[in-house]
């Protein structure tokens, strides 16, 4: 008997709600907010980045077709966390607060992301 394997989940450096900057690809330099993370494929959906169009057929008679736009996922290795205060992208490090909580900190600015 074979065991059913659960899909591999990758540890990602970004979380939903983070402000990031795209560092490679067609949308290089764009800054946006992470709307969704997909840990199984290590991808993120970012607001205003990698926008695709989809032509939707009419579902009912008399209804007209539409052209829908949506944000497609991009790989998490193509994004860096972005400091809105300093206007700079940075890698992250993990540090502990005085209370003993583990938080993410931007290496360039020292700004703590997790509040």
Swiss-Prot record:
Stored InterPro entries: KOW, Rib_uL2_dom2, Ribosomal_uL24, Ribosomal_uL24_CS, Ribosomal_uL24_KOW, Translation_prot_SH3-like_sf
GO molecular function: rRNA binding; structural constituent of ribosome
Cystine residue pairs: none
Entry keyword Cell membrane: no
Recorded GO CC terms: ribonucleoprotein complex; ribosome
Lineage: superkingdom: Bacteria
GO BP term (any one): translation
Name of a matching Pfam family: ribosomal_L24
Keywords in alphabetical order: Ribonucleoprotein, Ribosomal protein, RNA-binding, rRNA-binding
SUPFAM superfamilies noted in UniProt: Translation proteins SH3-like domain
Subunit text: Part of the 50S ribosomal subunit.
Its job: One of two assembly initiator proteins, it binds directly to the 5'-end of the 23S rRNA, where it nucleates assembly of the 50S subunit.
Family listed: Belongs to the universal ribosomal protein uL24 family.
Designated name of the protein: Large ribosomal subunit protein uL24
Organism: Crocosphaera subtropica (strain ATCC 51142 / BH68) (Cyanothece sp. (strain ATCC 51142))
């Amino acid at each position: 008997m074979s065991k059913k394997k659960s899909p591999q989940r990758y540890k990602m450096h970004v979380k939903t709600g983070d402000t990031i900057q795209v560092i490679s690809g067609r949308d290089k330099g764009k800054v946006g907010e992470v709307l969704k993370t997909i840990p199984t494929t290590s991808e993120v959906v970012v607001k205003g980045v990698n926008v695709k169009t989809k032509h939707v057929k009419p579902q009912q008679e008399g209804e007209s077709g539409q052209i829908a736009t949506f944000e497609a996922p991009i790989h998490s290795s193509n994004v860096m966390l972005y400091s809105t205060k300093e206007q700079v992208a940075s890698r992250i490090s993990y540090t502990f607060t005085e209370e003993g909580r583990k938080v993410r900190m931007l290496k360039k600015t020292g700004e703590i992301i997790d509040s």
